[in-house]
């Protein structure tokens, strides 16, 4: 009986120490977990390129890589003491290792929050890391459509100028018709002008002769 009574306080003491140990561990995790969770590594990569997320894990531990969508984590890679296992996540292409993963052929949908969790041999959590990945879109390339637009604009300008010239040319027959030279060549126009000049000259001669004749008649009457 005495031995039972003596062992009872020892058991209680051990239990209390265990409770205090667990309490202190939870208290430390509660105090420092927000700091750890908010320690984010910012990484960026070009669309269509590759990006590597690097951790400080050693190769002799297990590592769990996952993607965080805001509500839940999705396992994408589990590296267990030298044995890599890649779990596809929406067609995610990557290489897996304890201290890093490489994501290939990045798309805009790959942007987001990623996490890495390292485990010791005993299975306890060793460290925890957050990554914020940003995939930069490709720069817009100049398409041939812009050149086509320029050509169309230039063609339009040339067409307008050509239409003006055509309009001026179309007015020429009307002006020539008003002057009496419709559908005539330059040689015909010169001949026509010469004939008009001869007719005018003959009319002037007739007028002069008639005036001279009238003057003679008036003198004979006197």
From Swiss-Prot:
Q: Which Gene3D superfamilies match?
A: Immunoglobulins (2.60.40.10)
One Gene Ontology cellular component annotation?
A: extracellular region
**What subcellular compartments does it reside in?**
Secreted; Host cell membrane
Bilayer-spanning residue ranges? 193-213
- Please report the record's description of how this protein sits within the membrane: Single-pass membrane protein
Transmembrane as a keyword?
Answer: yes
Q: Which UniProt keywords apply?
A: Glycoprotein, Host cell membrane, Host membrane, Host-virus interaction, Membrane, Modulation of host dendritic cell activity by virus, Secreted, Transmembrane, Transmembrane helix, Viral immunoevasion
What main location does UniProt list? secreted
**Superkingdom of the source?**
Viruses
UniProt's post-translational modification comment states:
Highly glycosylated.
Q: Which GO terms describe its biological process?
A: symbiont-mediated activation of host signal transduction pathway via agonism of host cell surface receptor; symbiont-mediated suppression of host dendritic cell mediated immune response
In the UniProt record, which residues carry a glycan?
50, 56, 60, 71, 105, 109, 125, 132, 147, 164, 168, 189
Q: Which family does it belong to?
A: Belongs to the RL11 family.
- Annotated function: Plays a role in modulating the host immune response and affecting host cytokine production. Structurally and functionally homolog of host CEACAM1, induces endothelial cell angiogenesis.
* Protein name stated in the entry: CEACAM1-like protein UL7
The gene designation is UL7
């Amino acid at each position: 009986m005495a031995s039972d009574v003596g062992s009872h306080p020892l058991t209680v003491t051990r239990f209390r120490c265990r409770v205090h140990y667990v309490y202190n561990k939870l208290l430390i995790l509660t105090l420092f977990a927000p700091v750890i969770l908010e320690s984010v590594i910012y990484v960026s990569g070009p669309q269509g390129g590759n990006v590597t997320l690097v951790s400080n894990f050693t190769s002799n531990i297990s590592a769990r890589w996952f993607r965080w969508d805001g509500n839940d984590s999705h396992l994408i890679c589990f590296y267990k003491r030298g044995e890599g296992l890649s779990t596809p996540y929406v067609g995610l292409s990557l290489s897996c290792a304890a201290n890093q993963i490489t994501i290939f052929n990045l798309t805009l949908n790959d942007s987001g929050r990623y996490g890495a969790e390292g485990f010791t041999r005993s299975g306890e959590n060793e460290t925890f890391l957050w990554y914020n990945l940003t995939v930069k879109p490709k720069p817009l390339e100049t398409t041939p459509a812009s050149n086509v637009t320029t050509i169309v604009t230039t063609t339009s300008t040339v067409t307008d100028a050509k239409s003006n010239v055509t309009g001026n040319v179309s007015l020429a027959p009307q002006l020539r018709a008003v002057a009496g030279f419709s559908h005539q060549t330059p040689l015909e126009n010169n001949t026509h002008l010469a004939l008009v000049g001869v007719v005018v000259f003959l009319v002037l001669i007739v007028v002069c002769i008639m005036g001279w004749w009238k003057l003679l008649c008036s003198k004979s009457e006197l």
